[in-house]
């Protein structure tokens, strides 16, 4: 597996993985699925978008987007979102994406990486972030509406 900046040829695989996570309704705040046009614009608008691809470089296993979390005096803080295809979860792809995003954030002049909306029940992500040295900043009670309509806490890191 290799993590690299995305290329146009990756878009269909990226959209597939992104939409899978959106459809699951338990991790991303987005509700609208991306089509090819919207996906191309969305991923291009990020400060950095990267993919994890298999050794042949053609199959997208996961991805992340990186962008400013705020502006002005807080513009040195970035935010990321990670997505790994369900068939490849549990293979440390997410960890490689997080580690690459830390390097890319620094390369793009950011000093801090903040995760805004980690759903409390997303124990795999929370464990990974804590293992990599991130600290939970608090709890936003009922901050995330799950696909089935109930609300869960958000744990920013």
Predicted regions and their residues:
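A short beta-loop-alpha structural element at the N-terminal edge
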Residues: 2-14
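Acetyl-CoA-dependent GNAT
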Residues: 8, 27-87, 98-99, 104
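Helix-loop element at the rim of GNAT/NAT acetyltransferase active sites that forms part
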Residues: 16-32
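Conserved beta-strand-loop-alpha-helix junction that forms the acyl-donor binding cleft
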Residues: 89, 115-125, 143-147
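Conserved acetyl-CoA-binding loop-helix of GNAT-fold acetyltransferases
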Residues: 90-107, 126-131
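Conserved GNAT acetyl-CoA-binding A-motif
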Residues: 105-118
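Conserved active-site tyrosine of GNAT-family acetyltransferases
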Residues: 129, 134, 157
């Amino acid at each position: 597996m290799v993590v690299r900046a995305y290329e146009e040829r990756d878009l269909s695989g990226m959209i597939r993985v992104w939409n899978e996570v959106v459809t699951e309704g338990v991790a991303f705040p987005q509700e609208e699925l991306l089509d090819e046009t919207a996906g191309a614009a969305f991923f291009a608008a990020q400060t950095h978008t990267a993919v994890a691809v298999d050794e042949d470089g053609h199959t997208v296993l996961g991805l992340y987007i990186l962008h400013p979390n705020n502006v002005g005096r807080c513009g040195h803080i970035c935010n990321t979102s990670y997505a790994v295809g369900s068939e490849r979860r549990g293979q440390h792809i997410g960890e490689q994406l997080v580690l690459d995003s830390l390097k890319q954030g620094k390369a793009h002049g950011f000093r801090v990486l903040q995760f805004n909306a980690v759903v409390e029940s997303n124990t795999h992500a929370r464990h990974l972030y804590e293992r990599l040295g991130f600290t939970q900043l608090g709890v936003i009670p009922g901050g995330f509406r799950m696909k089935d309509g109930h609300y869960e806490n958000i744990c920013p890191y």
